A protein has these predicted regions:
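C-terminal beta-signal and adjacent terminal beta-strands/loops
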Residues: 41, 90-113, 129-133, 140-211
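Gram-negative outer-membrane beta-barrel transporters
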Residues: 2-93
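Extracytoplasmic loops and strand-loop junctions of Gram-negative outer membrane beta-barrel proteins
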Residues: 9-16, 53-57, 116-123, 186-192
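Hydrophobic, lipid-facing positions within transmembrane beta-strands of outer-membrane proteins
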Residues: 25-29, 68-74, 132-138, 201-207
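Short sequence motifs at beta-strands and strand-loop junctions characteristic
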Residues: 11, 19-24, 62-66, 124-133, ...
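A generic structural signal for solvent-exposed, polar alpha-helical segments
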Residues: 51, 70, 82, 102-105, ...
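Active-site rim elements
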Residues: 59-60, 120-127, 137-140, 192-194
Length: 211
């Protein structure tokens, strides 16, 4: 069940069976630059493999098999209590199972599930594109006798990267919102695949007061 990731559901599921086997292995690398002449940073890289056995006992990538994960956090302290920080993240494309469009289009199936049925004969055979994001933050601190004031500007996803996940599978609808029947088979609906993207620039202004 854990391998289903965000696709976990209850409609049509069979009793849980612990007969499958899985394994995960990899390599981690970390380098740190402690504060030196105003500069600091941490670089972390992970090479990972995560897989489990399918219904035929063959190893396939798990939903968490991202392969390459990179994280870089760095900053510089300027004079007069100004500070600039950046963070970059990269996660390689993760596997997902494509839809069984033949089964999903059957009216009696769709009317019950209201969603696409995964094709377990092609378990985790596709991958979403890699995800990456760059964040930027600027801080200015004023120190007083018994307290300090920190004003900051934080901009996440500064270059507005649009991440892509498993596409949506849905039925085509007419202008009244009713499902359209396949003209070549009255027992099926017409389906359509819609892109599933997310991501936007997120600026934040904040104030921190320390006593």
């Amino acid at each position: 069940m854990a391998n289903l990731g965000a696709d976990f559901g209850v409609v049509g599921n069979v009793p849980a069976n612990s007969s499958a086997r899985g394994r995960a292995f990899g390599l981690e690398f970390l380098a740190q630059q402690k504060l030196y002449k105003g500069l600091y940073g941490i670089l972390a890289y992970t090479l990972v493999r995560s897989e489990f056995s399918d219904k035929n006992g063959n190893p396939v990538p798990s939903s968490w098999d991202a392969r390459h994960i990179l994280s870089l956090t760095a900053g510089y302290k300027f004079k007069r209590n100004w500070e600039l920080g950046v963070r970059f993240r990269f996660v390689d494309g993760q596997p997902y199972t494509p839809y069984d469009t033949v089964t999903s289009s059957i009216k009696s199936v769709w009317d019950i599930t209201q969603m696409g049925i995964s094709d377990l004969n092609r378990l985790n055979s596709e991958r979403i594109p890699a995800y990456h994001q760059l964040d930027l933050r600027v801080d200015k601190v004023w120190y007083f006798n018994k307290w300090s004031l920190n004003l900051y500007l934080d901009i996440q996803n500064i270059y507005n990267f649009k991440s892509t996940t498993r596409p949506f599978l849905t039925v085509q609808e007419d202008q009244n919102g009713n499902p359209i029947t396949n003209p070549n088979d009255s027992n099926r609906y017409l389906l359509q695949s819609l892109p599933n993207t997310a991501g936007t620039v997120l600026p934040t202004i904040g104030i921190i007061v320390d006593f």
